[in-house]
């Protein structure tokens, strides 16, 4: 679809009011018809809408911004997998487009967060080390899920620092695929407290018995909030192991915590341990 033709379809769409909200000129039937017509243009329509995006907060940006979301959503509500994949490939191809504002590049990631699948992962992985985009990129990969997404995060983790490193390990912890175990065991010794805590959550979530040593050691040396969070991860791992029938492994974690949590401030941990031990007796 030619850009001029696309503009004619987009121009009648609702414009935001003085508060930046779409509250007037809302005719759902007409909007749905327009969106379906734009969607018929396939990948070219999506690329055209992206080209039309303007500066964040401007009227010029609002209509193509709205249309782009509606068109991507159209593929989902009509259950058109071929169209969904085609649209998401178009979105992914523009994530690295530096002629777009950071805001709009992040917006493309947000669309991929809920509409994207494996086809979006390589493009999302390429900008994980960009501090301005890392939030949107990592969140999208975590939402897509699976090893294809996790592998992109693990690759980026090797070079990530600061905010990017925290976002990436958080996303890996949410995905909790077994292939990330080695990264979690290394990251739990990281110099950044937030990275260590996220790594402990990842180790708890992958539910592997051999993660217990790393978690217990980290919890023993931690203080304050970090000690609380990593101890909680130890308890979560024990619960997962018990649920999987690995009672001996769960018991070892509980017994270790029982011996080391003697301070009055950690009596609630001892109580949780007693409940856990009773459940696997």
Where are these regions (language model features)?
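Buried hydrophobic core positions in alpha-solenoid tandem helical repeats
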Residues: 5-9, 48-53, 90-95, 123-125, ...
